[in-house]
């Protein structure tokens, strides 16, 4: 739940922060605006490093709980779970910080200002960093991001458990190789309808403590110095009272990449004058010169620095040990039994079943030998994604299957091929393990092919080991010889289950036609191998839903550099998807009936959708009840997700579910970006998927359709 700030304490923090800043020299002030802020011993101020990572667990700071990557957690479609994960990240951040500071360790990645979550919209599956996000949909991203932040920051009225940071503000999703000079051109309609809603939600609803600007320009303005984004929208319209940080070394890009300033002095002045309080990097050392030249006032510096110190005070850094409840958090919380149990629960929740002809779940009592084949089968890297921590133990898919089957069933393994290269050993012929693949298949009762990607193939610009030289994928194909290995498995005549590890959509058309089952496991975290095995053998029931669209080909996509939403994502695409957003199968069947609305028109307080959901199968399951809204007039988006709830059902059990739709669920933005609820008819769909023809065909059922009629047009102030 969102913490309710104590007004008296907030006023105290602002006064104390301003008083402290007033005692500093200009040189000292400038030093405190760098991400590595040195100690000021004469004022009793300890050194502090603002840079910590935590999109799926505390990253780069030693042992921590390594949860599934963000895109995988998004597939759970579970707001409550995201709050639990956010809280776990905040708790482990506190445990590490409290331990490290007692030993005088104030190094990078060990602080309480956690630069997470990444709430950019995953508009194009080629973007390398998309797996850090919650997918392509503004509503889903907003809901999951809000709950993650609420969990991380805690509910104490006086103090933050940790300070979350919404990044990267605001129109940022590749290309990675161009980010230091790229200008994202976006209409006001797309800006306010797609790219800004999640940031607004985190500021207005979750009270996120920090916002990070992006590397690129948006409509000509560098994001970390944008008057439109930082002042007009974030500060003035949304009344954001936290601090703003640059992405790392992004301010240097103003004069080296974007060419909007003449040099470092002008760059730092532009950033600070528009409200960028913290510089990840060292360029703000030029602020003293900028003040001397009259390009920025010392009062502006005081404003920024005061905001930074209010954050540190909200974290309890200048209060006594016994005043701050979070100071009691010990290092024993890190990688604890409770954290490990939560991690497995989360990994279980993300498993997304894309195809199943009845082969799954596998019955180990009927198996003698299982073949496990593929470059990701025994890969730790394929469990993780980027910005990961270090787990005390990892379980690969191969290990998870071996552990689950024990001595009862023989497991035969082949790496199959290199993840992307022509061969594994430089002296060998191309695809040198294909004969081994065929041999393993011949001996096996069922073949589990574990293919896909890892963070060396999709990630941030310049990732070590990324053979594409930037973090983006060149296409949507399985890399290297992976599809040939899959074909060899299929041609063996044995049942083939494809397990995909990765953080983005792949065009697995051959697998869709020929594999018996497909399980998308994402980057499932340190316990991912256990979760995959549990899903394959029916210990758990897959419940994931796709937070992104799987396309047939990258030819179905607009140009990567085109930020217009036309033709992109499930909301605007005109072609049929391979696997649609919101889709995912189960080992049981859920029935929906008695769908109803609390009103035929949405008033100021919105309306409620109710539906009865029944587990009509023989095993327990957990289903996502999804509500989509479509304005029934020309030139409007496809049906859009506007409501979501998870429901647990035993076989034969029925529950009535209620989902609230606020009036804003019926609003679309006009050309100026103003959200307007037009008079007219709206279709409301409730079920287990989108209402599109492909989803209906794959699910074997259509969502219920209801109608809302708005009698008057009204603009909303959002």
Predicted regions and their residues:
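Glycoside hydrolase catalytic-domain context in secreted enzymes
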Residues: 1-670, 678-686, 690, 717-718
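Short proline/glycine-enriched turn/loop segments at secondary-structure junctions
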Residues: 672-675, 695
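Short beta-strand elements
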Residues: 693-717
């Amino acid at each position: 739940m969102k913490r309710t700030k104590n007004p008296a304490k907030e006023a105290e923090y602002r006064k104390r922060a301003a008083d402290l800043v007033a005692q500093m020299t200009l040189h000292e002030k400038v030093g405190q605006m760098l991400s590595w802020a040195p100690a000021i011993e004469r004022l009793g101020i300890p050194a502090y490093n603002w840079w910590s990572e935590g999109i799926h667990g505390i990253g780069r700071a030693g042992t921590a709980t390594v949860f599934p990557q963000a895109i995988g957690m998004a597939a759970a479609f579970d707001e409550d779970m995201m709050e639990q994960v956010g809280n776990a990240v905040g708790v482990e951040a506190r445990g590490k910080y409290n331990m490290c500071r007692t030993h005088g360790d104030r190094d990078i990645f060990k602080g309480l200002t956690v630069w997470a979550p990444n709430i950019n919209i995953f508009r194009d599956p080629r973007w390398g960093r998309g797996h850090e996000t919650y997918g392509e949909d503004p509503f889903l991203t907003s809901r999951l991001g809000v709950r993650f932040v609420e969990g991380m920051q805690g509910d104490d009225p006086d103090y933050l458990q940790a300070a979350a940071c919404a990044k990267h503000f605001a129109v940022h999703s590749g290309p990675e190789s161009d980010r230091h000079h790229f200008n994202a051109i976006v209409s006001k309609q797309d800006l306010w309808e797609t790219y800004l809603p999640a940031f607004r939600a985190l500021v207005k609803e979750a009270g996120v403590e920090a916002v990070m600007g992006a590397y690129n320009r948006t409509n000509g303005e560098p994001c970390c110095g944008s008057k439109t984004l930082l002042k007009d929208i974030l500060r003035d319209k949304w009344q954001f009272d936290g601090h703003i940080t640059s992405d790392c070394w992004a301010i240097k890009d103003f004069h080296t990449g974007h060419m909007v300033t003449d040099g470092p002095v002008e760059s730092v002045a532009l950033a600070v004058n528009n409200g960028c309080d913290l510089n990840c990097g060292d360029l703000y050392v030029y602020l003293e010169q900028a003040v001397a030249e009259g390009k920025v006032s010392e009062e502006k510096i005081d404003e920024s620095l005061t905001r930074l110190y209010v954050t540190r005070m909200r974290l309890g850094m200048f209060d006594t040990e016994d005043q701050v409840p979070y100071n009691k958090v010990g290092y024993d919380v890190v990688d604890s039994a409770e954290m490990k149990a939560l991690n497995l629960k989360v990994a279980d929740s993300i498993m997304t079943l894309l195809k199943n002809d009845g082969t799954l779940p596998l019955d180990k009592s009927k198996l003698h030998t299982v073949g496990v084949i593929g470059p990701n089968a025994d890969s730790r890297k394929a469990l993780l994604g980027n910005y990961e921590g270090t787990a005390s133990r990892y379980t690969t898919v191969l290990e998870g299957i071996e552990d689950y089957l024990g001595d009862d069933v023989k497991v035969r393994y082949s790496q199959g091929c290199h993840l992307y290269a022509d061969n594994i050993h430089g002296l060998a012929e191309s695809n040198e393990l294909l004969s081994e693949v065929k041999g393993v298949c011949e001996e096996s009762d069922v073949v589990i092919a574990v293919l896909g990607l890892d963070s060396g193939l999709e990630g941030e610009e310049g990732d070590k080991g990324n053979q594409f030289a930037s973090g983006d994928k060149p296409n949507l194909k399985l890399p290297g010889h992976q599809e040939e290995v899959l074909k060899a498995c299929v041609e063996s005549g044995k049942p083939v289950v494809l397990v995909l590890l990765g953080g983005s959509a792949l065009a697995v058309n051959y697998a869709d036609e020929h594999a018996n089952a497909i399980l998308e496991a994402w980057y499932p975290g340190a316990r991912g191998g256990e979760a995959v095995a549990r899903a394959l053998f029916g210990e758990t029931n897959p419940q994931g839903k796709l937070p992104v669209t799987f396309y047939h080909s990258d030819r179905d996509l607009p140009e990567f550099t085109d930020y217009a939403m036309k033709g992109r994502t499930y909301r605007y695409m005109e072609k049929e998807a391979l696997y649609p957003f919101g889709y995912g199968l189960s080992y049981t069947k859920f029935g929906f009936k008695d769908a109803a609305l609390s009103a035929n028109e949405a008033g100021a307080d919105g309306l409620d959708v109710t539906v009865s959901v029944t587990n009509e199968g023989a095993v327990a399951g957990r289903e996502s009840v999804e509500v989509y809204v479509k304005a029934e007039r020309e030139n409007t988006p496809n049906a859009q997700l506007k409501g979501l709830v998870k429901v647990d059902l035993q076989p034969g059990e029925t529950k009535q579910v209620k989902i609230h739709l606020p009036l804003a669920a019926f609003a679309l933005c006009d050309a100026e970006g103003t959200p307007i609820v037009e008079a007219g008819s709206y279709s409301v769909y409730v079920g287990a998927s989108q209402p599109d023809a492909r989803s209906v065909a794959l699910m074997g059922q259509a969502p219920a359709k209801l109608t809302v009629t708005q009698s008057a047009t009204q603009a909303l102030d959002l």
